[in-house]
Amino acid sequence: DESAHNILLKRFQYYLLVGGMPEAINNYLADRNMTRVRQTHKDIHNLYRIDASQYDEDHKLKIRKIYDLVPSNLENKKKRMVYKNIEGKKGKTFSDYADEFEYLTNSGVALEVSAISNPRFPLVESEQKRLVKLYLNDVGLLTSLLYGLNVNAVLQDIKSVNLGTVYESVVAQELAAHGFKLHYYDNKKKGEVDFLVDDHGKLNVLPIEVKSGKDYTQHSALNNFLETSDYGINRAIVFSNERKVFEKRGVTYL
């Protein structure tokens, strides 16, 4: 019922603030003190930044820069990594920073999402490493970096705050935690879909969209994707804030 839904929603909102790091959770449960929780997030964030001791100084600096760019990149429209911003040099590509990206993803500090323009099962056969998104490994770290101690950014319905990046990060973390390799759809003519995952049961690809606004049934890129007969994909999932579960034209809204 609505009462139970509101309770679960409030707890989910606090999860967005606290995240899943054991120390952050324990500090929150001890006295509900968000100042202590945010300090824990800062400590973990700083530890991640300096925890590249196996590399020489040049690699360390690039790893830190890439990691520091993650929140601001996610706030951009395309959300993908802009390689020229890492060192302020034009003409740079993914291959110039492959070692740094590998460190961040293999260590679990960041989640890599590779582009797919022509989806086929299994997705790994058609991924493009040149267009990569990175998400932080914990949503609490992200909201700490974005909003600091202002919990109202998440707890209140503030029109000036777009929580799309936060919700996408949660979905990325959950998909990764359940063993899915992360991809997204990027096509100049058809648009972009937030996530693509392999559906091993149906030997097909499952597209996933994450919506934070009231217009969650409007998704032109997803429609274009599903209407492309060459792909042979006729089902998708859209996550939203609405307390409604229904299916329409192959799209399941949750």
Please state what every model-predicted region is.
Residues 145-149, 220-221, 248-250:
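Short conserved micro-motifs at the rims of enzyme active sites and ligand-binding pockets
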Residues 225-232:
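Arginine/glycine-rich "motif VI" loop of SF2 helicases in the C-terminal RecA-like domain
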Residues 241-254:
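Domain-level recognition of nuclease-like catalytic cores that cleave nucleotide substrates
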Residues 16, 21, 25-200:
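Accessory nucleic acid-recognition modules appended to NTPase machines
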Residues 1-20:
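Amphipathic alpha-helical segments of the small helical/lid subdomains adjacent to P-loop NTPase cores
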Residues 205-214:
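Active-site ExK catalytic segment of metal-dependent nucleases
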Residues 214-224:
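Active-site-adjacent loop/helix micro-motif of nuclease/hydrolase catalytic cores
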Residues 234-240:
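Short, hydrophobic beta-strand segments that form beta-sheet elements in well-ordered domains
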